[in-house]
Swiss-Prot record:
Claim: Chaperone is one of the keywords in the record: yes
Region span, Disordered: 1-85, 117-144
Subcellular location: Nucleus
Phylogenetic classification of the source organism: Eukaryota, Fungi, Dikarya, Ascomycota, Saccharomycotina
Single GO BP term: chromatin remodeling
Source organism (scientific name): Vanderwaltozyma polyspora (strain ATCC 22028 / DSM 70294 / BCRC 21397 / CBS 2163 / NBRC 10782 / NRRL Y-8283 / UCD 57-17) (Kluyveromyces polysporus)
Membrane-crossing residue ranges in chain numbering: none
Chief location category: nucleus
Any GO CC annotation of this UniProt entry: nucleus
Listed name of the protein: Histone H2A.Z-specific chaperone CHZ1
């Protein structure tokens, strides 16, 4: 037993040493923080050079760009207006007023419902009857 305990302790000590080695590696490898100051300086230089170029031409860069964008938008809007359909060409006789599409066949729904009721295929309040029966069955199940 004593030998087994010694072996276990030796293994534990070895595991602890490996953990320490891993933590040392992590601390030795320092992460460098990115330095964006150089990039910021380059960007500001580019912006200044653009402003001086646009200043020499006599226009501000932002104004000329916005004017170009406005012109593009105006042309796009005019193209959309040309592409829109003319509503005067629509024949109003083809518009369905009832709200139900029947593919050109005119159906009197009241008459059709009466005919079906007379034939006994459906009752006029069929949906309500089914709901009431379901409710009665459900109530009976839970009364126990």
């Amino acid at each position: 037993m004593a030998e087994e305990l010694k072996e276990k302790r030796e293994l534990e000590v070895e595991e602890d040493n490996t953990k320490k080695d891993n933590s040392d590696k992590k601390s030795k490898v320092k992460r460098r923080r990115r330095n964006y100051d150089d990039l910021d300086a380059e960007v500001t230089k580019d912006e200044k050079s653009r402003k001086t170029k646009s200043g020499k031409s006599g226009k501000n860069g932002s104004d000329s760009e916005s004017e170009v964008d406005d012109a593009k938008l105006d042309t796009m809007i005019s193209l959309e207006d040309e592409q829109e359909d003319d509503l005067a060409e629509i024949d109003t006789s083809n518009i369905i007023v009832t709200g139900r599409r029947t593919r050109g066949k005119i159906i009197d729904y009241k008459k059709a419902a009466e005919e079906l009721a007379a034939e006994g295929k459906i009752s006029l309040d069929e949906d309500e009857d089914e709901d009431d029966e379901d409710a009665k069955e459900d109530d009976g199940e839970f009364d126990e």
